[in-house]
């Protein structure tokens, strides 16, 4: 029921962001490296050890400081200042390629599925910082993430009210239009809201940089997001971030056991590091985010869910193969794994890069 991907070469050029700041005026200079490093540490909770230390040493003052932050972070001035810094300090290396044969219709509702997970999916995070939430053909998006992520510093400033949890109940409420953010979008812009999810979740994050020539998609037994799309009658925008798995090295010990536990607990079990054990500073920021023609989930019925899931995985692999060489990853293959389907035993014994 799915045609092969027929990508075009339509790159997103530098453009003014939602803050009115023209990105073309900001060089990707080494002078901005300290700011970029600070942003990486901020988005990956690099402040957590200091926060714990402060709570132990001066708990009252620390709690007061946290309360002050959350009371001001919704102010327009605060968000504008923080987003200005994020735009200025975001790397220019990640790029976006439109591989869809025609632009998405912003008047239609979709479900966007971003692959792979990586370490908090820097490719999309970076592009949202630079271009705003609606850079994908004007489609109005809301990020659906782990429940605690929306409370992280920097995330609220980027996404404003366009971030929520990734539970089925919440995604259904967005697709059916009765989520508060969906109501606001319909009232202010007369456009539907598209939930953006990362189907692999924390389990897939555990497989970041697991193998130098294999990218693992942890979705062999994950059908929930496809079921949501079928029930709502919407198609799925397929997106892949090439290079995302090369940003960090991750702990190999008991990888599949930890991935299964991450799925059961709903908590991350991945431990990562950058070059020279510098933690949140990445090995590379050369990431290419590619979006493809929508997967026609609306053409399936719930009785066809297993077939839709199988077709989706085949379509995702076709999309991956169609662009991997252009994006500098022609040597890689995509392998689907899951709770009951661990990686190929021989592959897991192969040498791992930087691990």
Positions of PLM-derived features:
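Extended, polar/charged low-complexity intrinsically disordered and coiled-coil segments in eukaryotic
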Residues: 55-72, 77-78, 276-278, 325-328, ...
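Catalytic core of membrane glycerolipid acyltransferases/transacylases, capturing the structured
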Residues: 62-78, 89, 106-187, 201-220, ...
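Alpha-helical bilayer-embedded segments of polytopic membrane proteins, i.e.
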Residues: 25-68
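Non-catalytic C-terminal accessory region of glycerolipid acyltransferases
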Residues: 2-17, 21, 176-177, 181-355
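N-terminal topogenic membrane-targeting module
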Residues: 77-99
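Cytochrome P450 fold signature focused on the C-terminal beta-domain
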Residues: 93-94, 166-172, 326-333
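A short acidic-Thr-Gly-centered motif at the start of a beta-strand
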Residues: 100-104
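A residue-level signal for beta-strand positions that form part of recognition/binding surfaces
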Residues: 93, 109, 140, 194, ...
């Amino acid at each position: 029921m799915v045609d092969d991907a027929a990508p075009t070469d339509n790159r997103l050029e530098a453009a003014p962001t939602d803050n009115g700041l023209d990105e073309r005026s900001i060089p990707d200079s080494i002078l901005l490296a300290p700011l970029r490093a600070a942003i990486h540490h901020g988005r990956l909770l690099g402040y957590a050890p200091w926060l714990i230390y402060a709570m132990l040493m001066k708990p009252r003052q620390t709690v007061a400081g946290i309360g002050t932050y959350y009371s001001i972070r919704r102010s327009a001035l605060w968000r504008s200042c923080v987003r200005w810094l994020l735009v200025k300090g975001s790397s220019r290396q990640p790029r976006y390629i439109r591989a869809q044969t025609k632009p998405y219709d912003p008047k239609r509702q979709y479900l966007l599925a971003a692959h792979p997970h990586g370490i908090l999916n820097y490719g999309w995070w970076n592009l949202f910082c630079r271009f705003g939430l609606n850079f994908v053909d004007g489609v109005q998006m809301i990020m659906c993430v782990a429940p605690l992520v929306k409370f992280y510093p920097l995330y609220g400033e980027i996404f404003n009210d366009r971030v929520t949890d990734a539970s089925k109940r919440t995604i259904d409420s967005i697709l059916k239009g009765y989520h508060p953010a969906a109501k606001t979008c319909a009232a202010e812009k007369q456009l539907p809201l598209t939930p953006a999810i990362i189907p692999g979740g924390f389990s897939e994050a555990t497989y970041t940089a697991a193998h130098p020539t294999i990218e693992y998609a942890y979705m062999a037994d994950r059908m929930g997001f496809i079921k949501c799309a079928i029930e709502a009658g919407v198609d799925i925008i397929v997106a892949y971030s090439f290079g995302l798995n090369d940003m960090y090295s991750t702990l190999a010990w008991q990888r599949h056991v930890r991935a299964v536990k991450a799925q059961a607990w709903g908590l991350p079990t991945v431990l990562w590091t950058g070059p020279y054990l510098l933690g949140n500073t990445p090995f590379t920021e050369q990431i290419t985010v590619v979006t493809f023609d929508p997967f026609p989930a609306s053409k399936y019925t719930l009785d066809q869910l297993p077939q839709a899931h199988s077709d989706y995985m085949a379509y995702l692999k076709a999309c991956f193969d169609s662009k991997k060489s252009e994006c500098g990853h022609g040597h890689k293959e995509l392998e689907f794994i899951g709770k009951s389907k661990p990686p190929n035993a021989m592959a897991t014994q192969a040498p791992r890069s930087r691990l």
